[in-house]
C-alpha cells in the first residue's frame, strides 16, 4: 500500500506586509522589510528601551475580511489575525463550505495577556474613557459574557471551526515559538494516519504590548540596540543583539493528494516529514551544541525517508539572538556532517524581513518554504553585513537567490528548548 501523500492547497497570511501572502512573497523577494519605529501605548516617547517592531496596520484590513459573527469586541487582536489568515487560506484553496464540514482545525497562539484591560476597553469607544476596575464591577451586566474566555488559548481554534462550520477535531497547540509549526506537523500526521482528509493548521500571535515586550526585554531576548535603526534585525551577523517582535498569523490547508486532485486543486508543495524534540537543557536558552535542533531535523528527514544531502534549503529559525543563531548554525553543520554537503546548502531567515511572530512564526515561514520549492526562488536574509565567524553558511545575504529547491526544511525553535522541523518537497506527480 502506497503511503498517503499530503499537499498544501491553500495559504493565508497576516504580517506587517499586509493581508495577502502573494504581496508578502513578492515584496520579500524584492528585499523589502516591514520593521519600523514602535512604542507601547501609554509610555512617554523614547522611554521604552525596545523601539522597533513589525506591527500589523489594522486600518488597512479590507472590510470583507471581518466577516465573522463574533468579530466585535469579543475577538481580540491575535484571534482576528488568525481568523483572517485561516479564511484567506480556505478561499485560496477553493474549498466549499460543504467540503469543510469534517476538517480538523489546529492552531497555536501565544500566552493570554491583557484580559482585564480588554474587558475595560470593551466598555468605552475611547481608551481614555475606559472605566476602572471598581466601575467594571459595578457595570458587570454590560460586560459581554464571552469576554472572560476571549483570550483563552483554545479560543482561536474554536473561532475558526465555528466560523467555517467544521465539526471535525479542534486542537490547540501551546509550545511557544514552535507552536504554529507543531500545529502544521500534527495536522500532517493526523491526515497521514487516516483520521481526517483535510486540515486547516497554523497560528496567530501578538506580543506588541507593554507587559509582554517588557518581559521579552528582561529575558534578554528583545533587542534594544538603536544604532542600526530599522536594520536592527540581523540574523547571523556579528552585531546581532536580539529579536525584533512582529505580529500576525498564518494558516495553510493540508489535504491528501488524492482528494486535492479529485477536486481539481493545484498543490503548492508536498509535506514530506515532521520532527519534534526538546533540548532538556535550559528554559531561557538553547543548547549551545544544538543537539535538540539536530534531532528535530533528523526526525523530519527520517520521517520523510530522506537523507541530509538531499536537502537544498533550510528556512532557519534565525532569530537574530546571539545564542540561537550560533547554535542553529552548528546544528545544521552537525546534521550534514560532510563539509561539501553543508557548503552547498542555502539557508534563509525570514525574521529579518517581518520580525518574530512568536507562536505564529512557523506558519508564514512554512509558506515561504513551500513557495521556494514551487518557484525555485529563496527570500534573502537582510542586514547580514558582517558575518559571525561561528555563522559561516550561505544565508542568502541581501538579495533573493534563484536556485532549484527540490527538498527543504523549515525550522522553528521555541523558548524552553522546544524544537520542530518540517520537511517539504517540490510537488510532482510521481512519488519520491
PLM features: residue spans?
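Acyl-CoA/ACP chain-elongation machinery
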Residues: 195-241, 275-288, 318-325, 342-394
